[in-house]
Each structure stands twice: as C-alpha cells, then as structure tokens.
C-alpha cells in the first residue's frame, strides 16, 4: 500500500486564509459607511493579502512555518482598513460651509437677534439633511452630489430682515388708514387736513427710524406699536 502524500497542513491553512478573506469581504460589503468604490478597493486589498499569505504558506517548509504564515495572513486580512474617507471628507466640507454661513448671519446688522438665531437653526437643519444624504449615498459620485447640494442649500438660507420690514409696512398701513380718515373728515378744512396728514407722515418716519435701530424682535414690535399709536393719536380737530 502506498503511503498517502496529502498536504493537509498547507491545505487547511490556505482554507483558513480563504475563510478569513471571505469574512472580511462580507464585513466590508455590509459596511454602510463605505462607498461602492471604497468597498471595491478594500476587498481588492483583502484579496492581495490573501494571495500573499497563501504564497507564503506554499513556501513554508514546516508545520510551524505554515501556522505562522496562516496567522500573519489572517492578521493582515483583518487589518485591512474600512475607512470611509469619501463620506468623512464630504461631511467636513458641509460643516465648514455651515460655519461660514452662520458667521455671515451673525455679522449681518439688518437682522434681529431672533432672525439670526432662526437663520442659523435653518443652516444647522440643512447641514444635517446634507450629512444624512451623504451617509445614505452609495458611490463616490453620490457623495459628491449630496455634498454639493447641501452646500448650495446652506448658502441659500435667506438673510432677510422680515421683522423690520413687516413692522415698517404696518406703520405705513396705519399712516395710510389715518390719512384716509383725515381726508374723508368733512369737519376739517383743506388746510387742517394737510397739516394733520403732515403730522402723520412725521410720526411714521419717527417710528420707522426707531424700528431700524431696534436689535430684537421685541424692540421692533414695541417701536411698531408706539408708532402706530402715535399715528392714530394725531388729532382731527376742526379748529
């Protein structure tokens, strides 16, 4: 009977390497932080490490060498990095865009404190949406597209001083209503109507100047209320 010549040590070691490579590639494939390109690159690196390990096993001359090369190969396979650089870089770019936009908002003198805070909160909201979209992207191209879309959305957050504009519009409307009432007051002479309407315009200007100088929504509202009251208090007295 022939003595069997079965290289079980090397075969078992290479099978173990193949299993380690399969397990690592499965982990890479199922890593949601990696893009398609990052997964493919990492799995190619695993295949490279597996080949090196099996070549080293084939070159080994003792069971101890085989075991050592199997161990080294398994460690090298498991050490292949799963680093989501594309998504990390994209999210860092979104964070920088958000920081720049919030600085611009904070330094805008036309905005009230509340408008600044609301605009900055909107920036944070757009940044979060962008980063969530980046996390959900599956390719480098998707990541770049979501990064660019997020930066555009952040930069598009309006810096519109609506509180002051609305307050001044309300003062203008109060002035218009008051002047209409004066004009339609049959008890007043032409000169009395003109004098009263000039006083209304004066009060409206004072109110709008005060609104422009306000720094908070509360200040704006207070100046609007004071101005409207002053306009409505202009007398319609037929002397």
Predicted segments — roles?
Residues 1-239:
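Thr-biased low-complexity repeat/linker tracts and other Thr-enriched repetitive architectures
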